[in-house]
Structure formats: C-alpha cells, structure tokens
Amino acid sequence: MSIAQLFNQSWVEKSKYVPVRLSDEERKILSLLEAALEVIDYTGHVDIISYTTRTKLMVKYLNEMCSIVMGLVTAMDIKAGRDLLIGRDHKSNARFFQTVFEIGRRYKIMNPEKMRATYGAVMYMCQDSLIPDVRSQLGFDFVSPIKTVYNVLEKHKLLGLLEEKQLLNNLLKQSDPQSNANAKAELLKEREEASETLLKKYNPGKDEKLQKVLTDCFASLADHEAFLLANRNPVEKMRAYLHKFFNPHDTKNGSLKIGYMTGAKLNHDHKTQFFYVDQSLVFWSCMMDQMFLLWLESDASLLDKHSRYFISDTGQGLNRVQLCPLVRSTVTRILSSVQKQQEIPWMGSSVIHLGDRDVPNALMFIDKYRQVPHILAPLVKVLQQLEFLRDPYLVQYIENEYGSVNGLQKTILLDFFRHGFNGQGSDGGSCIDGRLTSAWNWTNEITKKKYYRILLMSGFLNFEGI
C-alpha cells in the first residue's frame, strides 16, 4: 500500500476504526470509572515480583474495583445502584462492568491527552481479567469490543451511508485555522446541506432514535478528521520548514552535520542528516494518519487471550512485556510504504522495537507515538507566530541577536534537526522508536537554550499537550 492509499482510505475503511463519541449517559459512567481508578492503585499492588501466585492478588483487587464502582453508582443514583445490588454478586453484573471499561477504553482512544495516569490501570485490569485462572474465580472478564461507527451503522443496517463519498466529504471537511470568515461560513453551509441530505435519505421517517444514531456517527467521524488536522498537520508543516530553510545539497543556510564529537550517537554529513530527518517526519506523518487504527490494534494486542505477558525489569522499572504482532504488522506495513516512496535509500535502522526492553508492550508503544504532536505542534505554532510579532522591542531584540525573525526561525530549526535527531534515544541510535525518543530528549533540554526566553514571549508554553 502506498502513502497515497494510506492517506485516502474510503469512509468504509475509516469507520471500522473510528470509535463512537460518548453519549451523556456514558460520560456519567466514565466519571465513575475515573473516580474509582483514583481510589485503587492496581498496578502498584499487582505488578510486583513475588514468590507467591499473583492470581489471588488480581482477583482481590479486581473484585475491590467492582465494589468501588458499584458503591459510586449507588451514591450517584440509588435506583440504579439498587438494581445492581439485586444480583448480589459481581458476576450477575458482568455486562455492566464490561460496559464501564469499554467506555473508558473508547474515551481514551478519542481523547489521547486524557486519562494519562489511569488508562494503564484500565488496560491492565482488563488484561488480567482474561487470564484463565482469574476469569474462573471472578466468573467473568472486563472486556467487550470497542463500539465503532462501522459497528453501529451495521447494527442499524445503514452501511450504505458510508458509500456517500461526496456528501461525507462535504460534511466532514475541516476548516483551515488560517482561513477567513467567508471561507468558514461557506464550509459551514456545505456541512449543513450535506447533513440534511443524508438525514433525509437514511431517516425519512424522522425517527428520533435513528436521528441520534446518525448524528453521533457524523460527530464521531468529524472527531477523527479533526484529530488528523491537529496531529498530522504539525508534522507536515515541520517537514515544509525543513525544505524551506535547508537544502540537502547546499550548506549555505546552515549545516545539519552531526558527529560523535558533538555528543551524537550518529555520524551524518549534512545531506545524510537532511534525508534522515525528512524520512523520519514522513514516517511520523503516516503514523499520525493511522493513529486510530493503531489505538484499536494496541487495545486488541493487550487484550489478546493467546498472548500472555511476563513481568520484567526493563531498566525503567517493572513492566509487562508482551509481544504485539498485530501492531508490529501495521507499523511494518506503514514503514514499508514510506520506504518505497523514497527516492534515495532509507537512512538509519529499520528495526521496530515492540515487546522488548525498549518498548515492552503495545501500551508503551501507543503512548510513545502520542507524543509526536506534543513535540511538533508547539514548535510549529511558535515558528508561525514569530512571523506576526507586534512587539517592536521584542522584534528589535531578535534582530540584534539573530539578524532577523527568519534568522531566529533557522536557529531553532537547525538546533532541533541536529540535536533532536542525533540518535541518543535508544541503543539502536537510529532505530524507528529511537528517533522519537531522541526528539523527546531534546524537548527536555529546551530550557537551557539561548532562545528559550524568546519562545516564552512568543506564546510557547510546554511540550505536555496542555
């Protein structure tokens, strides 16, 4: 599959990995789950090196989690709590608990910046509930399939809607943040007309429940497109800056050369480093485009009944190490597509660390690539804002120090492209995940940069995605 095919999948294919937006009732359940997760430190109790069986610990704390959730439900809605307590045991409420955890998993996929401290516990609880001995003692597990747009439309026999390519394109087209008011108004009009046409065609009887199903699916697909705009565009813009300010065959605008003498783990001349950075950015862009698919596959890998994990000290504390062939297959396919599109040979290693000490499991993998927009979006935003500075004193300071705003932009980019891609991220140096770790390590050094104060005055906050 080519890069163009990756970026231009049909709505039928996209809908298979786009989760459905949470309803108001589901958001209430989510708040209960998050509250319960704040009370119990599951991994702290269970993920330990022990000479005794961990099964008893798992069963104990999974039962405790169920009890906490039921208690919170009763406190919020006594009638709903009473209905749950009628069954007396947790097994009789298995479907409810599966729904609670599915809502948490689905919400995280659609909102990667949320549940940072608790999502791991959600996945590990679900993972442990699938262990045969644990499931046997509990009487059930916490896992149910993620609700996607495709599943919902299939259930209501509305899959034909996904073939309405032109109408869906008009409905889900995203506005450019730089576009003017007239363009935004025109886009809004197109969306309204497309929505009205689709609703008339697929809900001619104006059934309220069906109307809600359709509007929820539209909103969920729109969320996916908005995610692409917010997460893939910064990568594309950073790549555009690379080509604007630097030439692989000329160093007059600054040399990207790195070597062991400068603290790098790689030894690249200017041309090699240019293409090393460029290829890395192309790969990241493709990864962002397929992020929802990767989230679902990471979820499936972690909850694979046939793939057991083991606890190991990976050098970053105790972690669950688990093979994830499903995710590896997709990443390999994306990498292969990128490599085939390159005019020159692939620079650096093609090793993908998954299920080893560098990237122990699918959860660690997906969390790692979640950082891409956190690194690039703030940088791109500042680089753009520098072009529209209105403070004459700040502009004067920049001109005195760097010659011009353009000179400052080039300084920042030169620093990032050299030291953010210097191979310090992993033992492999230039391996696929090591490139991203190198960039993240560079962000940790940002406060030591000479230009850091100017970044702050230009609107920069942090690289935390907040």
Swiss-Prot record:
Taxonomy, superkingdom = Eukaryota
**Any one Gene Ontology cellular component term annotated for this protein:** cytosol
The record's InterPro entries line, in alphabetical order, gives: DUF2009
Main location, first listed in the record = cytoplasm
Which key words are in the record?
Answer: Cytoplasm, Nucleus
One Pfam family named in its UniProt record: DUF2009
Q: Where in the cell is it found?
A: Cytoplasm; Nucleus
Q: Which family does it belong to?
A: Belongs to the UPF0652 family.
What PANTHER family does the record tag this protein with? UPF0652 PROTEIN C16A11.03C, UPF0652 PROTEIN C16A11.03C-RELATED
What is the name of this protein? UPF0652 protein C16A11.03c
Organism annotation? Schizosaccharomyces pombe (strain 972 / ATCC 24843)
